[in-house]
Amino acid sequence: MGARASVLSGGELDKWEKIRLRPGGKKKYRLKHIVWASRELERFAVNPGLLETSEGCRQILGQLQPSLQTGSEELRSLYNTVATLYCVHQRIEKKDTKEALDKIEEEQNKCKKKAQQAAADTGNSSQVSQNYPIVQNLQGQMVHQAISPRTLNAWVKVVEEKAFSPEVIPMFSALSEGATPQDLNTMLNTVGGHQAAMQMLKETINEEAAEWDRLHPVHAGPIAPGQMREPRGSDIAGTTSTLQEQIGWMTNNPPIPVGEIYKRWIILGLNKIVRMYSPTSILDIRQGPKEPFRDYVDRFYKTLRAEQATQEVKNWMTETLLVQNANPDCKTILKALGPAATLEEMMTACQGVGGPGHKARVLAEAMSQVTNPTTIMMQKGNFRNQRKT
């Protein structure tokens, strides 16, 4: 509790304990509310140290606000507590939680108007958000919007449900869009089990970091005034760099996209893990005699994602093996379509292959190819002399 008590100084704590939970109510904020908020933030994988400053509280509020409409009562209580704490840090006198929330809303409206005005002045409405989650605050500084609990929960749920099947990689890529190395480490740290897989991932990251250092040796001499130091492999992995340094590299001119570089290393490691969890080779994926073409394509692409190959090689695998390993019925149709056929055309053409409707059509075509003379002979011999005397 001692560490959490340091969130407020003595004078601030006095002000905190004078604020009522509800307008006209008797209950007031106590130290236990800060302790509870810290624990809740830890549960959401958010650094509780952010509660110690007004800027940190602002970041937490920005992170929680999108979830308020659909969030639980605990989430609303956490938002209210942080909003009140923000006002105490800012030395804004408030009697209760509602007044604190009104103040937050007022500041957010002002911020929105200034952002809209700035966008109108520059003629570029995307200027504020183009580097999200790194955004520009009212003072013109580039600040970081921490990864949201909703994103973290989605990531944890994917790993729990899918383990490390191939679809985990595109999901990780989507959820970590624009993330800093700190965000990426937060995502990795939320994975509770699968420690063997996480150790493999760590080894891959260390290998890539060492390779980065080999290809990007440190320049001799002092750093020029106003310039940032060059990131080392461990900086990119977020172990020896601060969040401010990461933001600086990512927003510098020209930028060094440490987040994207680290993300590539992680995806490389995830590919190795997926390969271990899904040992089936793409060469082994063949369409069963009665398997619908759609199901075969699903299995094919799921395994293809786990293949450790360049995109060019994967394209070749798709163009060659998808047709080559189809069952005879589908293969005949696909070869007739030609090599330029799209996947949509293939799936449309092979729809229903193997089913009773397809078999009936094949039988009808075979019957239509019977020569006319044979048909006539069969008709001439209609039931003649069938009854023996």
UniProtKB/Swiss-Prot annotation:
Q: Name one GO molecular function term.
A: structural molecule activity
InterPro entries xrefs = Gag_p24_C, Lentvrl_matrix_N, Matrix_HIV/RSV_N, Primate_lentivir_Gag_pol-like, Retrov_capsid_C, Retrov_capsid_N, Retrovr_matrix
Q: This protein's superkingdom?
A: Viruses
Q: Where is this region: Interaction with membrane phosphatidylinositol 4,5-bisphosphate?
A: 73-77
Question: Which residue stretches belong to region Interaction with host CALM1?
Answer: 8-43
- Matching SUPFAM superfamilies, A to Z? Retroviral matrix proteins, Retrovirus capsid dimerization domain-like, Retrovirus capsid protein, N-terminal core domain
Please provide, in alphabetical order, the Gene Ontology terms of the cellular component aspect for this entry: host cell nucleus; host cell plasma membrane; host multivesicular body; membrane; viral nucleocapsid; virion membrane
* Annotated region described as Interaction with Gp41, given as residue ranges: 7-31
The protein's matches in Gene3D superfamilies, at most eight in alphabetical order, are given as: 1.10.1200.30, Human Immunodeficiency Virus Type 1 Capsid Protein (1.10.375.10), Immunodeficiency lentiviruses, gag gene matrix protein p17 (1.10.150.90), Single helix bin (1.20.5.760)
Keywords from UniProt, A to Z, are:
AIDS, Capsid protein, Host cell membrane, Host cytoplasm, Host endosome, Host membrane, Host nucleus, Lipoprotein, Membrane, Methylation, Myristate, Phosphoprotein, RNA-binding, Viral nucleoprotein, Virion
Q: Where is this region: Interaction with host AP3D1?
A: 12-19
Q: Give the residue numbers of the N-myristoyl glycine lipid attachment.
A: G2
Question: Asymmetric dimethylarginine-modified residues are where?
Answer: R387
Q: What is known of its domains?
A: Late-budding domains (L domains) are short sequence motifs essential for viral particle budding. They recruit proteins of the host ESCRT machinery (Endosomal Sorting Complex Required for Transport) or ESCRT-associated proteins. p6-gag contains two L domains: a PTAP/PSAP motif, which interacts with the UEV domain of TSG101 and a LYPX(n)L motif which interacts with PDCD6IP/AIP1.
Spell out the family assignment given in the record's similarity comment: Belongs to the primate lentivirus group gag polyprotein family.
Share any extra remarks. Answer: Isolates WMJ1, WMJ2, and WMJ3 were obtained from blood samples sequentially taken from a two-year old Haitian who was perinatally infected by her mother. HIV-1 lineages are divided in three main groups, M (for Major), O (for Outlier), and N (for New, or Non-M, Non-O). The vast majority of strains found worldwide belong to the group M. Group O seems to be endemic to and largely confined to Cameroon and neighboring countries in West Central Africa, where these viruses represent a small minority of HIV-1 strains. The group N is represented by a limited number of isolates from Cameroonian persons. The group M is further subdivided in 9 clades or subtypes (A to D, F to H, J and K).
Its assembly, as annotated, is: Gag polyprotein: Homotrimer; further assembles as hexamers of trimers. Oligomerization possibly creates a central hole into which the cytoplasmic tail of the gp41 envelope protein may be inserted. Gag polyprotein: Interacts with host TRIM22; this interaction seems to disrupt proper trafficking of Gag polyprotein and may interfere with budding. Gag polyprotein: Interacts with host PDZD8. Matrix protein p17: Homotrimer; further assembles as hexamers of trimers. Matrix protein p17: Interacts with gp41 (via C-terminus).
Report what the protein is called: Gag polyprotein
**Source organism phylogeny:** Viruses, Riboviria, Pararnavirae, Artverviricota, Revtraviricetes
